[in-house]
A protein has these predicted regions:
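Acidic metal-coordinating catalytic centers involved in nucleic-acid phosphodiester chemistry
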Residues: 74, 79-186
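Short, surface-exposed loop/strand segments
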Residues: 1-101
Length: 186
């Protein structure tokens, strides 16, 4: 069972990003999670970062794509945003924001049901580490242990449950929640 079964209807990219940022705030509060707004010149290919070297980027399909089209969109999004880690103009942004050496780049998607994106993530990891090896002075913001990790909604079951079931919400999510399913916390 997927945690997405508790969310009714289509989730927009903005709603997915808002939900992911809330989840990262909860999970990485002790690591001082900092969100990055895409306003004022862009987000540098990340939605936020922690002080222990985790950055994340969200992606939600714009519509119900075929498996092939969905993979193509995910692959292209990952390639574009990981590519920003290697471009001098984005490196400057990351350093100006105080992003520490990046150990993990999380690609956060609603569902992970295509092994090709895992393979592509490994290809991108190798490319980033090869670039770092070829020019270590330029890529000091990349850890020697750099990893690309695929995360999906089910990885944040606890955080999403807390967000959805919170009795006193001081935030607004653009989501409809199904109330006919009972959560199993075991």
């Amino acid at each position: 069972m997927s945690v997405l079964q508790f969310i009714e209807g289509y989730m927009s990219g903005n709603a997915w990003e808002d939900l992911c940022v809330m989840c990262y705030r909860m999970r990485y509060q002790d690591e001082h999670y900092t969100p990055i707004s895409a306003a004022q010149g862009g987000d540098g290919g990340i939605e936020g970062f922690t002080q222990n070297g985790i950055v994340h980027q969200c992606y939600c399909p714009e519509k119900n794509y075929s498996d092939e089209d969905n993979y193509t969109h995910m692959r292209d999004k990952m390639t574009k945003d990981i590519g920003k880690l290697l471009k001098p103009e984005y490196i400057k942004k990351l350093k100006d924001w105080g992003v520490p050496s990046i150990k993990e780049w999380h690609f956060v998607i609603p569902e992970q049901n295509d092994s090709r994106i895992v393979k592509h993530a490994e290809t991108k990891r190798k490319e980033v580490l090869a670039a770092k090896k070829s020019n270590p002075k330029l890529y000091t913001h990349i850890s020697d242990e750099f990893k690309v990790i695929i995360k999906c909604a089910d990885d944040f079951l606890l955080e999403i449950s807390r967000i959805v079931l919170a009795p006193h919400k001081d935030y607004h999510l653009n989501l409809a929640i199904r109330d006919a399913i009972t959560l199993d916390y075991t």
